[in-house]
Design a protein with these regions (language model features):
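Conserved short submotifs of the Hanks-type protein kinase catalytic core
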Residues: 97-114, 118
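Protein kinase catalytic-loop region centered on the HRD/HxD motif
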Residues: 158-168
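Activation segment signature within eukaryotic-like protein kinase domains
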Residues: 152-153
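Protein kinase glycine-rich loop
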Residues: 23-30, 35
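Short beta-strand micro-motifs within the conserved protein kinase catalytic domain, predominantly
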Residues: 83-101
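Conserved activation segment of eukaryotic-like protein kinases, specifically the C-terminal portion
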Residues: 207-224
């Protein structure tokens, strides 16, 4: 079994490289690529740390590559945020003399369970190993939902404040983008459609090229639904946090149904807050 070594220009300057075994199976697959477990190696000290390396699919459109590059650039250290480590571009010369680019996104390796899975009763990681903190949180969710909600929301708000202080908005907060880790943290992940507020343009409405809304409709603030970039700011994320708080207490989101109906309700219907007090 051979070892794959990845090192971009930034990594060369820092004296770092990433490696993984070529025969390893992916630990995750998404719409943009496959994720593998790898190792970050310091060339000077020999120190290592486990990392997650996303091998992006070939032939992705330029806007998808740029989105991944932007995600990898949000490199903040906070107990409640996933740590992004780098974006690596590798140029390969084909047998025909052409240059083919390969792109990789590197982040810290998280093991645990997503909040969405936890709320469905799952407390084991991808290897089937129990996550003690998740087991405690599940007991709270089942027996004291308000305490559960406070724990989750206060932790995510801590990470979100760091993100906002750095000038970014997340724009895709929902339970599938929150991880309960083996080492006892609650982390906000997936900065795929996050954006610096001072660089928002008409190309950053939160829509795909075809005009399809990118985020989760159940958690989308009206300005996201409308693609109104003028009013996308920290309160866009706070709206999603309010929906998350509601869900943690009540057990479901305020608006349910077909996607188009949920988007319409976000624009026209007041949140049914009476359910929180029942």
């Amino acid at each position: 079994m051979s070892v794959i070594r990845l090192q971009g220009e930034t990594e060369k300057w820092k004296g770092l490289y990433y490696q993984l075994d070529s025969g390893d199976e992916p630990i995750g697959v998404g719409g943009m690529g496959q994720v593998f477990k790898g190792t970050c190696v310091n060339e000077h000290t020999g120190a290592t740390r486990p990392v997650a390396i996303k091998f992006m699919f070939d032939d992705l459109p330029p806007h998808a590559i740029e989105r991944a590059r932007r995600e990898a650039s949000i490199q903040l250290r906070n107990d409640n945020l996933v740590e992004m480590l780098g974006f690596i571009e590798i140029a390969e010369r084909t047998q025909y003399g052409d240059v083919k680019m390969h792109y990789h996104v590197v982040s810290e390796l998280l093991t645990g369970v997503s909040l969405s899975d936890l709320m469905e009763g799952k407390t084991t990681d991808r290897d089937g190993v129990g996550v003690p903190f998740a087991e405690k949180l599940l007991a709270d969710y089942q027996n004291d939902s308000e305490h559960f909600a406070r724990t989750v929301v206060m932790n995510i708000l801590s990470g979100l404040m760091a993100l906002h202080d750095a000038g970014y908005i997340h724009r895709d907060i929902d339970p599938s983008n929150i991880m309960i880790t083996q080492d006892g943290h609650i982390k906000l992940i997936d900065f795929g459609i996050a954006k610096q507020m001072n660089t928002l343009t008409t190309n950053d409405k939160g829509l795909t090229v075809a005009g399809k809304f990118l985020g989760k409709p159940e958690y989308a603030a009206p300005e996201l639904v409308l693609g109104d970039i003028r009013h996308q700011n920290q309160t866009t994320d706070i709206y999603a946090m309010g929906i998350l708080l509601y869900q943690c207490i009540v057990g479901h989101t305020p608006f349910e149904g077909p996607r188009h109906e949920i988007l319409e309700q976000q624009l026209k219907t007041k949140l049914p807050l009476s359910a929180v007090h029942n």
